[in-house]
Amino acid sequence: MNTKFSGKTLVASALVLTTLGTGLHSSYLGLDTNKVVKTAKAEEKMTDGQLWKKVKDSLHDSDIILSNEYETINVTYLLSNGYSSSVSAPGNDDGGHLTQSIDFKGLKQIDLTKENVYDDFNKKLDAKNTWNSLTEKLKGLGLLQNGQKVSIYSSDSSSPVSGKVGEGVTSGGENTLTKRFINKITID
């Protein structure tokens, strides 16, 4: 095998990959560089609807809500300037109409209203598994950080399920939660 040929091939391959990676020759591939730049900039900011949808999907995936029209999800969050704000929509919404750009700093509270609950009326959830699932999903989306205290409240229980992200449940993990009674989640 000719080592000069292999070396030249590697250098040429690296140059091609570097050039394509910078986007200089993306037009050669039929890509529109303006769209690529706009997409990257749009993802730097979040809308209140995108935040709301991430929270709603995490609640649904953790089996806390059904995502139907009989549920209302109100998300209170902290802005980078220190003020707080909130966004609310029914559970069957996609958040697409909520388009206010926000400078998100962190979640504060999630309030849930459930009316006319027919499905899962008596469904019981393992408190520890529910807490772990929700915090894992919210953390994976960048909405929670290690060390934050998260508590899940239920109107049929006097004590919440609480714990610290990255450490686990510290109280109430032995409880079961009746799905329809979960009404508030706080983040400190």
Predicted feature locations:
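A mature extracytoplasmic/lumenal domain signature
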Residues: 77-79, 154-158, 167-169
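Short, exposed beta-strand-loop hairpins at the edges of beta-sheets
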Residues: 159-180, 185-188
